[in-house]
Structure formats: structure tokens, C-alpha cells
A protein has these predicted regions:
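Hydrophobic faces of well-ordered beta-strands that scaffold small-molecule active sites
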Residues: 47-53, 77-79, 101-107, 131-135, ...
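C-terminal beta-strand-rich structural cap/linker in extracellular carbohydrate-active enzymes
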Residues: 433-455
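Short, acidic/polar
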Residues: 55-71, 114-124, 194-210, 297-305
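Noncatalytic carbohydrate-binding groove/subsite architecture in carbohydrate-active enzymes
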Residues: 156-304, 311
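Aromatic-lined substrate-binding rim segments of carbohydrate-active enzymes
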Residues: 63-67, 74-131, 151-186
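Bacterial Sec-dependent N-terminal signal peptides
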Residues: 14-39
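Carbohydrate-binding surface patches
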Residues: 370-415
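Aromatic/acidic polysaccharide-binding cleft in carbohydrate-active enzymes
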Residues: 286-377
Length: 455
């Protein structure tokens, strides 16, 4: 776990009758006012939504974890063997059976027991519940011993690199488990020596301490928390920027891990490659602190999932389901407070995933929708999804965290037979319905509008 940010704004989505004349910028429309957009399956987005939880240890209970995971609609859980003496097959089986979640499974902090991870992962595979392997958690904070050598932290990272090489090779040599991807080491931007962990596979001529061609992982992994500490001040587009693969990301993002490492400046991929590289976030989030109350935290959580998916992250796991009770400092990261008291974030994610719920066993034939958002503010973003029913879901969200609102209009190339507008911070029922309409107007500050569209 780690970082923080602040802000204040809680405006409700309000329907307006006319578009505004604010000075705005188009977003991802290639400079065009109107574009035909291919929808992504709703299930692809929902499958990306993950959560950190200790499940049944560290003061958490299985029944409450099941309740929280089911209510939140989370599709995967980040797990590992850390803190457990053995794999509790019954716990994982029950959590999977009652919620349908899959599990990433890994070493945790300071662990190197590859045999244990392989055996546990195989059991998850056998129950149809395995998603991916995960490697070391933040070896800058929790070093390891590999082949008798200390690595990570202030030591050389060569033992870390050798461990990862060996772990990856072991997974990929297994005739059954090799089908699953490896999520990489987190916070590798901290490496003290240039062992090449900034690459998935070290390319020819990289000049690293490990040889060219060394294979490490299938997905880059960041812990890109959307804040930098309890004293930070919220900025506009904060969660959008935290999801950026570029050097405009002020947090622990892909640029500082895979392009130019933030600790020692070791060079890795070029920026264009990182934009398109497979990547995940096994930890992100924000605490409650000055400027970020329960409402703002809940809105930011939804914006994190949306921004991450829109900007190319395959999987995102927010830290954490329920606040830690065995660690010091500000631990208000959770959807639930100690005692499993639901915060507003828990209600918002429930409403959000309920509105978007779809049959995960069916496939979606990608359709297109032609629309525009004239004079769109740079703090307004959009994502087009489609359910297996054929209905489109255009999600519009605002990141004007410093205050104020903008009036915007979404215009379609033809009249839509029905457009229903949902606000997940209010509930699961539509707040307005529009028939035979060619445009919808909204007021956006730090708001989320889900438009259910039937042509």
C-alpha cells in the first residue's frame, strides 16, 4: 500500500435543456467533433475491476469478504500466500463459488517460495478460479533472499532479477500453468542497479546487468495510487493523470517504471511502446483525508476504474476492501471501515456494477455508435461499452476536482429510440428517460453519468 490526494466537490448530475459555450477541448476524437466509436464489451470492463483483500486473515472474515465482494460486483481478487501456513482450499472455493471471482496469486512481500505458489495456483486452476501469477510486492520496501544473496531495498537488485527470471521460467515450463500470465514486480522503478526489470523481456543491446533476452513477465505492474500523501492538494484530472502511461503522470506510473526509472534514471522502453504494453495495477486507491471525504473517495474509486480501463490497463485492483486494523497511520483506504461498516464507496460501486451487470457467459458482437461532445472540457472523459443484449452504455465522467461544473451536450448522428440516464451515486434506477432524442445535456463536475442507449 501507499499514497494520497485531496479535493472537494459533490455535484449531482443535472439535466439541462441546452449545451454551453465554455472553452473546451475534444477528448480522444482525433480532433474531430464527431466520430464513430466501436464499443468495448461491458464484460471486458467489469472483468478488469479487482479488489485487494486478506480474505480471512488479518482480522478479515470469509463471510464478510464474500458479502463485500458480491455486493461490490468485483470480478477478481488479488491474493497470495503471505501470512498463511497453508493453502485453504475451502476458503478459496467458497469465495469463488459464491461470487464468481477469479484470483491473481503471488509472493506477497518478501516471499520467494515458488513451489508454494505453483502448488496453490494449480489448485485455483483446478477449481476454475485462477487468473494470473503475481511476482514480488514492492521489493524496495521488502527485500528478498535468493540463492543466499540479499536483494532489493538498498542492496543490489541482481538477486531480485535472478529470482524473477527463475520464477518466470518455472511457470512457463509447466505444461498446465504456462497458459496463465505473469503480473510483474511492482515499483521496479526503485531498482538500485540496472538489472533490466524495466523490461518484460530484455531487448538486444539494452546494456543491462542481466543478459539480453532475459524474460521476466507478461504484464508490467504499477502501484499507481491516485494521490501523493495526506498533505497533497487535489488537482483536476487527478485520477485520469494517475492512469496515464506518459510522463505527465505525477505518481508511480508506467513512465517512471518502464521508460526512465524514477530512482536512478535507467532507460527502458520508449513512450510509444509503454502506451501499448500489457499492464496491470495490483494496488491503487486513495484515503479519506483533508479535502477527500467519503463521497469524494467513492467518486474517485469509480473514476480510477474508468480511467484505468480507458487508458489501456487490463486489470485494476483497488486497495482495499476493508481497512487494515493491524497497521499504523491513515488506513482509510477501504470500501468498508473496520467492523465492515460500508462507506459511500461501497454503495457507489454496488450501484455502478449493478447498472452495468451483464451475462459473463455470453459474448458481445462489437457495435458502433456515432456521437460527439462539442467543446468538451479536458476534465470530462467518456467510455463506450456494449452489453450482450446489444444495448450501448456511454459512460461520461468528470474530474473537475478543484471545483466548479461544466454544461456539456452529447449529440448523436440520429435520434435514439431511448436514452436512460443513471447516476451510480444515487442508486440503480434511471434518473431520467428520453425517447426519440438526438442529444443529451449534462452538468459535470466530479460526476458520473451512465447513458443506456437503444438505437
Amino acid at each position: 500500500m501507499k499514497k494520497i490526494l485531496q479535493g472537494i466537490l459533490t455535484s449531482t448530475i443535472v439535466m439541462f435543456t441546452a449545451a454551453c459555450d465554455d472553452e473546451l477541448k475534444p477528448d480522444n476524437f482525433s480532433g474531430q467533433l464527431t466520430e464513430t466509436v466501436t464499443a468495448k464489451p461491458v464484460n471486458d470492463f467489469l472483468n478488469s475491476i479487482g479488489i485487494n483483500t486478506a480474505i480471512y486473515t488479518r482480522g478479515e472474515t470469509l463471510d464478510k469478504t464474500i458479502e463485500g465482494v458480491k455486493d461490490g460486483g468485483f470480478r477478481w481478487v488479488r491474493a497470495g500466500y503471505e501470512g498463511t501456513a497453508f493453502f485453504n482450499n475451502g476458503v478459496f472455493q467458497k469465495l469463488h463459488d459464491e461470487t464468481g471471482v477469479l484470483f491473481s496469486y503471488g509472493m506477497g512481500s518478501g516471499g520467494t517460495d515458488t513451489a508454494r505458489v505453483m502448488a496453490d495456483a494449480r489448485k485455483l486452476h483446478e477449481m476454475g478460479a485462477f487468473l494470473a501469477f503475481e511476482s514480488l510486492n514492492e521489493p524496495n520496501n521488502w527485500g528478498i533472499i535468493w540463492d543466499g544473496e540479499a536483494g532489493g531495498g538498498e542492496n543490489s537488485w541482481l538477486p531480485v532479477a535472478k529470482f524473477q527470471r527463475d520464477f518466470y521460467a518455472r511457470v512457463k515450463s509447466d505444461p498446465v500453468m504456462s497458459q496463465y500470465p505473469m503480473f510483474g514486480i511492482s515499483t521496479i522503478g526503485a531498482e538500485n542497479d540496472n538489472v533490466g526489470l524495466q523490461y518484460l523481456t530484455i531487448p538486444e543491446g539494452a546494456g543491462t546487468l542481466m543478459p539480453d533476452g532475459t524474460q521476466y513477465y507478461d504484464y508490467g505492474n504499477c502501484h499507481n495510487y491516485a494521490f501523493g500523501g495526506d498533505n497533497d492538494v487535489l488537482r483536476d484530472n487527478q485520477t485520469w493523470l494517475a492512469s496515464s502511461p506518459g510522463n505527465d503522470n505525477p505518481f508511480d506510473g508506467p513512465y517512471g517504471n518502464f521508460v526512465k526509472t524514477w530512482a536512478k534514471g535507467f532507460l527502458g522502453y520508449d513512450e510509444e511502446t509503454v502506451v501499448n504494453m500489457p499492464r496491470v495495477s495490483t494496488e491503487t486507491g486513495v484515503t479519506i483525508h483533508t479535502g477527500v471525504d467519503e463521497d469524494m473517495q467513492g467518486r474517485m474509486f469509480l473514476n480510477i476504474y474508468l480511467s484505468q480501463f480507458k487508458r489501456g490497463w487490463a486489470y485494476t485492483s483497488i486497495y482495499i476492501l476493508r481497512d487494515r486494523i493491524d497497521e499504523g497511520g491513515n488506513q482509510t483506504y477501504g470500501f468498508y471501515a473496520p467492523g465492515y461498516v460500508a462507506r459511500k464507496a461501497a454503495h457507489y460501486i454496488h450501484n455502478f456494477t449493478t447498472i452495468l451487470a451483464d451475462d459473463r457467459d455470453k459474448s458481445t458482437t462489437a457495435g458502433t455508435l456515432t456521437y460527439s461532445i462539442p467543446k468538451k472540457p479536458e476534465t470530462v472523459h467518456h467510455l463506450l461499452l456494449q452489453k450482450t443484449t446489444g444495448k450501448y452504455y456511454l459512460i461520461i465522467w468528470g474530474e473537475r476536482y478543484t471545483g466548479g461544473t461544466n454544461n456539456i451536450s452529447i449529440s448523436f448522428d440520429q435520434n435514439m429510440s431511448s436514452v436512460k440516464v443513471y447516476d451510480p451515486t444515487i442508486g440503480t434506477e434511471a434518473i431520467s428517460t428520453h425517447n426519440n432524442t438526438g442529444s443529451i445535456s449534462l452538468e459535470m463536475g466530479v460526476d458520473i453519468a451512465i447513458l443506456e442507449i437503444e438505437k
